[in-house]
């Protein structure tokens, strides 16, 4: 039987508060050579204004489509080159981010995430490409009987 100390819990989570108020929780597992980074930003679809429905989802998706220092290709080549993954998506109350990499590539993962959130570029060609993808997805949803019925009830 495993001892209670072997299970993750509050006893092995370290809490850091950055000067800007961001709270970081860390649980080390030295037996694993990879890291997982997850978090939320107070920017969900609930904050989409009238006539702007879908804006939070669109922006969350656009964040990894280009920054002031990296274009779409450079971001994804960096991720692929290190075997890392990074994603952002908007929920009702929050926009979440999640990433994973080898522990040695954590600085790159954090740098890419910070660049996406702090210095987004919203390149025109990516906006148009994503807009087309969103419109296609909406058209497909409207053909889905289960989706349409779920909206009615």
Task: Give names to the regions the model predicted.
Residues 31, 36-103, 124:
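M16/MPP (pitrilysin/insulinase) zinc-metallopeptidase core fold and M16-derived inactive scaffolds
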Residues 24, 43, 139-140:
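Contiguous N-terminal and early-domain "leader" segments and peripheral loops that mark the onset or edge
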Residues 22, 36, 150-153:
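Short glycine-rich loop/turn motifs
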Residues 3-5, 15-20, 41, 64-66, ...:
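A short linear-motif detector with a strong N-terminal bias
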Residues 2-34:
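N- or domain-start disorder-to-order transition segments that initiate the globular core
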Residues 74-153:
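Acidic/histidine-enriched segments that form metal/cofactor-coordinating
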């Amino acid at each position: 039987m495993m001892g209670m100390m072997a299970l993750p819990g509050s006893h092995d989570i370290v809490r850091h508060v950055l000067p800007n108020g961001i709270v970081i929780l860390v649980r080390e597992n030295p037996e694993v050579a990879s890291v997982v980074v997850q978090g939320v930003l107070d920017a969900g679809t609930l904050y989409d204004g009238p006539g702007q429905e879908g804006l939070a989802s669109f922006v969350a998706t656009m964040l990894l489509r280009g920054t002031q220092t990296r274009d779409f290709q450079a971001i994804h080549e960096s991720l692929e080159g290190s075997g890392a993954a990074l994603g952002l998506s908007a929920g009702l109350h929050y926009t979440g981010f999640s990433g994973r990499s080898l522990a040695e590539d954590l600085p790159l993962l954090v740098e890419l995430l910070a660049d996406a959130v702090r210095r987004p570029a919203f390149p025109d060609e990516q906006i148009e490409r994503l807009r087309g993808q969103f419109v296609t997805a909406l058209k497909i949803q409207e053909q889905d009987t289960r989706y349409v019925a779920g909206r009615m009830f």
